[in-house]
């Protein structure tokens, strides 16, 4: 059974969804989900300190706009040229590498006096479906602790540090610790019918949200369905050698048991040539270790979700949104502690 989107099914009748993460992964999913519901809230990490966002953060004292801007682009209901404009990066000069969308958000921040209000204003300008919220208004940095005890502060430094240490990340934390969550973000989570974590970089886009005071507690206390959208590939400098169960264990290590009920994973193969290119970058198709996932008491749903367009292995926005909404609508996942139910696209649910 397929959950088709339509003008009548999209709007107030759609479910309340809280999508938590950051970066390209979250924005990709939002592009698909906005066709099913307007009651969609993206809750976005603000720990980024690299690239154009890092420059604006250091020079203007604002929260990093990049991840928020990507989500805004995904949810925008404007002319295609406007979306292209938001993503445009200056090729030279003092603004080299900076995106117009980041600068627009920085300008709105100056007008509004707060990042939260600037994000709200940008949402109005772009007529977005749903809303985008920073998870916190606090100025935070991400600290990673490796299995050998070494530490590094700053999201942009984690990749090189992991290469130098040549071991896995044990855990991450925020500096300073225990920043307060945006009240609207906690409200969106508590009122959601469906809570989605990911897709996106595990330690630098997804987990940082769980470290903000109240976020993990509110997720666990919710009676909503809670899905983790597993990445298509492992990530060089962050999750080399990881399986789907490794991702889930990391989520539980940072957010405790009960943070997620179901893992949605891709089961489509990657084209051989693309796999070879990713292998050169120490990345591979994420392996689904079903027995370990079952031992964690988390349900597993497998769907073909891969898009290989443009030479990258990413989620197809339409396929991902369809899978999420189909699972939600049919309520085929039965949640029992310690019980595993396998779900594939070919099954007919009643």
Question: Which sequence ranges carry the predicted segments?
Answer:
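Gly/lys/ser-thr-rich phosphate-binding loops in alpha/beta enzymes
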Residues: 2-62, 66
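C-terminal functional extensions of proteins
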Residues: 2-3, 241-350
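Short glycine/serine/threonine-rich phosphate/pyrophosphate-binding segments
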Residues: 24-30, 199, 204-211
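A short helix->loop->beta-strand "cap" motif at the edges of active sites that frequently abuts
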Residues: 37-38, 222-226, 260, 298
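Short internal beta-strands
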Residues: 41-47, 225-232, 261-268
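Electropositive, gly/pro-rich neighborhoods at or near active sites that engage anionic ligands
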Residues: 47-166, 323-326, 330, 338-349
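Active-site gating loop/helix substructures
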Residues: 138-199, 203
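Charged helix-capping and loop-helix junction motifs
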Residues: 209-216, 242-247
């Amino acid at each position: 059974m397929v959950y088709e989107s339509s003008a009548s099914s999209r709007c107030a009748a759609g479910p309340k969804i809280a999508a938590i993460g950051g970066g390209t992964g979250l924005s990709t999913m939002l592009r698909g989900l906005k066709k099913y519901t307007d009651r969609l809230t993206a809750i976005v990490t603000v720990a980024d300190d690299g690239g154009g966002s890092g420059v604006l953060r250091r020079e203007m004292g604002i929260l990093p706009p990049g991840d928020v801007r990507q989500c805004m682009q995904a949810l925008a209901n404007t002319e295609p040229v406007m979306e292209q404009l938001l993503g445009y990066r200056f090729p030279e000069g003092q603004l080299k590498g900076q995106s117009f969308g980041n600068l627009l958000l920085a300008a709105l921040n100056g007008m509004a006096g707060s990042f939260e209000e600037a994000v709200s204003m940008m949402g109005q300008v772009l007529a977005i479906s749903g809303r985008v919220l920073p998870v916190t208004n606090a100025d935070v940095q991400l600290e990673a602790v490796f299995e050998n005890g070494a530490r590094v502060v700053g999201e942009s430094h984690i990749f090189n540090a992991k290469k130098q240490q040549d071991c896995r990340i044990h855990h991450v934390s925020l500096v300073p610790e225990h920043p307060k969550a945006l009240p609207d973000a906690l409200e969106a989570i508590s009122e959601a019918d469906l809570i989605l974590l990911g897709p996106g970089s595990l330690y630098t886009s997804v987990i940082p949200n769980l470290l903000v005071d109240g976020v993990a507690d509110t997720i666990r206390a919710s009676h909503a369905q809670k899905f983790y959208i597993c990445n298509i590939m492992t990530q060089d400098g962050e999750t080399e050698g990881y399986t789907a169960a490794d991702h889930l264990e990391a989520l539980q290590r940072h957010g405790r048991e009960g943070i997620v009920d179901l893992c949605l994973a891709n089961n489509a193969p990657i084209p051989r040539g693309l796999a070879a290119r990713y292998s050169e970058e120490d990345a591979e198709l994420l392996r689904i270790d079903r027995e370990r996932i079952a031992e964690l008491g988390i349900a597993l749903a497998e769907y073909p979700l891969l898009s290989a367009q443009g030479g990258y292995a990413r989620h197809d926005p339409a396929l991902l949104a369809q899978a999420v909404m189909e699972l939600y609508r049919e309520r085929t996942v039965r949640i029992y502690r310690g019980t595993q139910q396998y779900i594939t696209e070919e099954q007919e649910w009643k």
